[in-house]
């Protein structure tokens, strides 16, 4: 399928395990290089978390050693904490963006967990977290080495006390819970993220979260949806960075890859994702043959006007523009497509 396979190495937030790995970094780097060669992998992504500024230089040295041991064509990615305010202590301070960037192909900014398990309810990934994290990264590494991490999950809190308090929940599970318990959803235009509220009654069937049935009560869910993810995707173009990655595959909703395909082809039309002509629309849009009605709508089933047909044919045939002081037609003066209409007419179209 022409897909690069780059597995990730993680300590799963275990500080002692991460420290032990860095203490034996020469040996570990050798083992990773051997595995990449043995399984014909395309590289490795290093995701060591929950260390401190005390391990910063060791972390960088590990990536340097790994780069020396891997062939140049193999990819090295490093997952780094989102650091919108340039903190140099604690686990955010364990990543030297500038030095890591010199020895790796990209830094994957984990722009999520703004609020976390055991903490107060709140956004997992606000738009400001994503944007400020990109801005900080750009001050340290080239734009072509930056990936924006976008979550495919949210977190759920029970109002008051009791399980769960900020447990992770996939975007797919959110849809199920909201549907099952007839929940309500709202969208915050400031953080550009959705929040859902569900009420579980004593008599309701108890669905499970992380294997544990949820009890009666009111729950708040902060998560991601199509609108919030699309807004983050726009940041990729705004700052012209390498691209995006997500945590984690399998937690996304069924329609996610429909609009990711549109985004990867440079358009954000909300109304063509499952349309029978989607691929043709994308191709025509990429070739600049057709435009959208707005930036986010294409209106694929709307009838085509003569003006739109003229503009499309002029672009498709790459006809040189023609303008007349007095148009042959009495009803096109000042029309947005006047130039295209004149051009089409001059070519007997």
Locations of regions flagged by a protein language model:
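Feature responds to low-complexity, polar/acidic, surface-exposed segments characteristic
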Residues: 15-19, 265-278, 286, 291-339, ...
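Receiver (REC) domain switch/active-site residues of two-component response regulators
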Residues: 42, 105, 242
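Conserved, mostly hydrophobic/aromatic
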Residues: 46, 107, 148, 236, ...
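Substrate-binding surface in catalytic domains of secreted glycosidases
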Residues: 52-181
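Glycan-binding loop/region signatures in secreted carbohydrate-active enzymes
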Residues: 152-235, 261-264
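Acidic/aromatic/glycine-rich contiguous surface patches that form carbohydrate-binding/processing clefts
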Residues: 228-266
């Amino acid at each position: 399928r022409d897909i690069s396979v780059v597995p990730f190495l993680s300590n799963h937030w275990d500080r002692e395990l991460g420290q032990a790995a860095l203490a034996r970094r020469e040996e570990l780097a050798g083992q990773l290089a051997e595995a990449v060669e043995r399984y014909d992998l395309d590289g490795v992504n290093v995701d060591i978390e929950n260390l401190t500024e005390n391990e910063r230089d060791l972390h960088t040295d590990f990536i340097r050693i790994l780069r020396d041991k891997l062939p140049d064509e193999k990819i090295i990615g490093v997952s780094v904490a989102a650091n919108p305010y340039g903190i140099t202590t604690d686990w955010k301070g364990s990543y030297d963006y500038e030095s890591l960037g010199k020895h790796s192909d990209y830094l994957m900014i984990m722009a999520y967990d703004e609020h976390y398990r055991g903490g107060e309810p709140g956004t997992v990934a606000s738009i400001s977290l994503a944007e400020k994290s990109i801005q900080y990264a750009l001050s340290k590494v080239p734009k072509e080495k930056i990936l924006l991490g976008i979550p495919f999950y949210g977190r759920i809190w029970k109002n008051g006390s009791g399980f769960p308090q900020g447990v992770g929940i996939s975007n797919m599970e959110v849809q199920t819970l909201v549907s099952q318990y007839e929940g309500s959803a709202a969208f915050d235009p400031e953080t550009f993220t959705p929040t859902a509220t569900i009420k579980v009654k004593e008599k309701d069937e108890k669905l499970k979260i992380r294997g544990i049935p949820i009890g009666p009560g009111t729950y708040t869910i902060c998560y991601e949806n199509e609108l919030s993810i699309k807004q983050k995707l726009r940041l990729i173009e705004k700052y012209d960075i390498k691209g995006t990655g997500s945590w984690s595959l399998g937690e996304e909703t069924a329609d996610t890859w429909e609009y990711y395909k549109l985004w990867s082809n440079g358009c954000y039309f909300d109304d063509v994702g499952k349309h029978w002509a989607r691929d043709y629309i994308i191709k025509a849009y990429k070739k600049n043959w057709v435009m959208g009605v707005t930036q986010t709508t294409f209106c694929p089933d709307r009838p085509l006007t003569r003006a739109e047909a003229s503009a499309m044919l002029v672009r498709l045939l790459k006809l040189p523009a023609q303008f007349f002081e007095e148009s042959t037609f009495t009803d096109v003066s000042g029309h947005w497509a006047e130039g295209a209409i004149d051009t089409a007419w001059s070519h007997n179209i």
